[in-house]
């Protein structure tokens, strides 16, 4: 399945606080995702009440990105450290 993606304004709130090297990796991962979502370990975390899906992808070993999959488009809304990702996922479940 071919997926599209877009970055929400909320995504940039977290993105701007990342180190430059991680921002560069995030840009690389975004391009990789466009070509092949599996290449960034794209996965569905849970189905949301509205029928959309909460998803994640790997940026580096220590950083993840979160998005909502709706109508074959992922709207990325958060990026951060794996530790913060784990905390956020626990809160969302």
Task: Spell out what each predicted region is.
Residues 27-32, 87:
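Short, charge- and proline-biased low-complexity linear segments
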Residues 1-29:
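Arg/Lys-rich, positively charged N-terminal/basic patches that mediate binding to nucleic acids
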Residues 12, 30, 55, 76-78:
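Tryptophan-centered motif/residue detector
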